[in-house]
């Protein structure tokens, strides 16, 4: 390798942390645009009137954000989660979060009829359930309420720190 190429590559590698930081910042901005929609879908799927604690009370929207924002999470799935929420809002003319319970059910059923919508709802359901029943150290399943509702508890030994922080 010639000296000039070495210096160019060295400079590019030195900039990598800043390039990554820009991506994370843009993701946070994008998530803020659709976070309310995702939270509303999660709350509709797991409402407060069921045996299982509500998605809202368990903090699963924050769990979803932290999970898909992690650097090891698949970028395509991350984009899929955001784009799916944007598509749902587009189909509902930006008013999904304002719809009644019955209208949300109708909108989600219609969205589920599309292949894209079916896959998106499945992904949201999966991540939401991961949050509802994960070890509370990961920020959801507050007070182990998900485990209590199922009369099941996490394995032993319990995590002492978040896996993503190791």
Listing of model-derived features with the role each one plays in the protein:
Residues 13-14, 48, 131:
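Generic hydrophobic alpha-helical segments
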Residues 36, 40-43, 51-53, 59-166:
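Mature-region segments of soluble proteins
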Residues 2-3, 157:
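Short, intrinsically disordered low-complexity segments
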Residues 12, 57-58:
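A glycine-rich, aromatic-flanked flexible loop/lid motif
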Residues 17-52:
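C-terminal segment of N-terminal export signals and the immediately downstream linker at the start
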Residues 3-24, 100:
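N-terminal export signals
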């Amino acid at each position: 390798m010639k000296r000039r190429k070495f210096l160019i590559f060295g400079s590019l590698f030195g900039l990598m942390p800043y390039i990554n930081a820009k991506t994370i910042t843009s993701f946070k901005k994008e998530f803020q645009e659709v976070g309310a929609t995702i939270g509303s879908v999660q709350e509709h799927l797991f409402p407060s009137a069921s045996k299982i604690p509500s998605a809202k009370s368990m903090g699963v929207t924050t769990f979803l954000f932290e999970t898909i924002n992690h650097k090891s999470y698949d970028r395509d799935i991350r984009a899929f989660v955001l784009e799916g929420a944007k598509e749902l809002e587009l189909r509902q003319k930006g008013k999904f979060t304002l719809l009644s319970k019955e209208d949300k059910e109708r909108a989600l059923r219609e969205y589920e009829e599309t292949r894209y919508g079916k896959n998106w709802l499945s992904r949201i359901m999966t991540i939401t359930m991961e949050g509802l029943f994960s070890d509370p150290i990961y920020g959801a399943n507050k007070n182990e309420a998900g485990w209590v509702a199922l009369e099941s508890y996490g394995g032993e030994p319990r995590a002492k720190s978040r896996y993503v922080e190791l």
